[in-house]
Amino acid sequence: MLIDMVRVRRGATAAEAMVDRRTGRTWTVDVRTFDIATTVVTLGQWNALRGTETDPSQAAFPKVDVSWRQAVAFCNEMSLRDRLEPAYTITTIDAPTRSHATWTPHDEPAPYEWGVTWDREANGYRLPTAAEWQVACRAGSTGPRYGDLDEIAWYADNSLGFMHPVAEKTPNAWGLFDTLGGVWEWCWDQYDAEVYGSYRIIRGGGWSDPHWGCRVGVRRKTNPEAAFDDLGFRLTRTITE
């Protein structure tokens, strides 16, 4: 199973400007060199790692209905397969018996039940940071999109109400497909730990979203245990130069 990736070099663009439209806060991020997959993980790639056969007609569709935690675990499994150093250390303990006193929103596991730490020097597969994702999506462009939306993305106005295989639309200038539209993509970052706890950032918009949801700067959040039919993920690797 080949993961086609492109290299984004540090300094390829100016420090990326990030915006939190909820609070109005702005900041810049200096992004190190990294590799990022040209497509989101497909159902065929997901099943191949697990030794499961895939209907050829379904193999090129994005792998969806996958939680952030499942995506992190997949990254580590891929790293071990390719003899790379896993980027994540995952810790789990048995969950305590729940009561009204220990209930959390959406029955979300408490932080001490499932934890992930990221070794930022490891060369294994991982999820992109929100800043890395944004740099890769822009591919040196400016403005809310890197091209005409109908040409580059599957979204509400052209998807006919269902998901499509990857890489059918025009890629961006760096050869990445479907960074807008298609499926939302998990990022590493927490959205706002003080307000939303462990909720993670998702980017890019999906096949059922209106045009305003498919813009480079759009940041949304969801529970790391959540899994939806328009949410997938894209592999990234740290590169030391």
Model feature map: region roles:
Residues 1-80, 181:
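A short glycine-rich, aromatic-capped structural motif
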Residues 5, 204, 235-237:
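A generic structural signal for ordered secondary structure
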Residues 11, 190, 205-207, 238-241:
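Short loop segments at secondary-structure junctions
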Residues 12, 25, 52, 162, ...:
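Intrinsically disordered, low-complexity regions
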Residues 35-37, 187, 234-236:
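Residues within well-ordered beta-strands of beta-sheet-rich folds
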Residues 57, 68, 72-220, 227-229:
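Functional-site microenvironments in short loops/helix caps that host divalent-cation chemistry
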Residues 223-224, 241:
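Charged DNA-binding/catalytic regions of mobile-element recombinases
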Residues 229-241:
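Short, structured beta-strand segments at or near domain termini in extracellular proteins/domains
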